[in-house]
């Protein structure tokens, strides 16, 4: 290999999210607010007089019992033995089990002392009644599934690991904590096989960077509408057609038909909200049920831009005019839009814009939108597309009363996903509120609602350290806002909670498909 390319394989592995290190996973687990870990990297002689040292990755307390945790990646070579012998992980867990039983009394006393010290210092500690503290004699193995794509080989590997671990379940406990995208893909494909999609078949065509290919998680073109909750299937397609909205990931390049992708966040958003878009009371209950809303809302207003009267939620909403220098708004394509939109008045009679951004299994690698090139000959390295974006949005950010201003926006957080979307949507809502000429949806205020499953750790718990000092997506974004209460992150199940009793059939469908 030529010397100048020698670092390529190493960098590919370094920046490949499937190759995230065990230490990085461990650090992310510790930094999360829940569960709280009492200790990490605990090391101790196996027993008095022994030279052998044993080490646990994490220690926590559950139900007044000390739990010792070993962490492994799904791809770790120690999880399986290539020639069929007992894998190293089994021997390792057996050693942990014997160590805990041998030293249980000493471990309880040690951790009582550590607990009191951390409590005195005001450090995070798990809930516990120290007088009742005992020890769980079975160590717990946490396996992090870092796979981003599902293959038959990977499924076989996971099944073999589970089979071997189950044979030793009397000695230790284990859990595979997955990559949310991978887990949801498995759930959706299982539902597809179980006729949840009314007999729809996978194997549809997806047109992506690698051209046109068939995938088992893409519905066949004739089954595409079965990607929707049954009562909305015909109406949602008509809505997009009548309002001139292009579909994301459409079965055809012209955006005229819905996506057959069963993990589409656009489809997920519509399945959650489209059914209630004309139910004024349901929409009001929905937004007043969101914890942390900066106002209490009195009335939901119909959205004038819709093709039919009486719509209280709009989808792929754009502004009535070009506020962001984007060469004209087109719903669903090539401009800033919001996945869903609600228009309301508060108890004081003042109008609010409520743009909703919807995420499902998305996660993002580092990609600087301010340094992107145009495609074509002679464009590489000129950052033409990035410079266009900088010229389009930088002045708007500098005049914003919500976004923190920076001395230079090249490579900044505002031009990295998912923040690039959030930045543009914030400017979108702010510019409409500030405009004296806005006649379609004039408003005095806005609140930005970001819907994302709380289990999507690759998106929410990622440390965007290249562009932020804060850990996690929510903290990183709120650090860039002057009024943090105008941004609300919520799980879709929590969003729909006010409708559990009034829309049982809808919520049962959503629970079966999305909330497991």
Language-model regions, residue ranges each:
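Charged, terminal alpha-helix-loop-beta segments
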Residues: 1-516
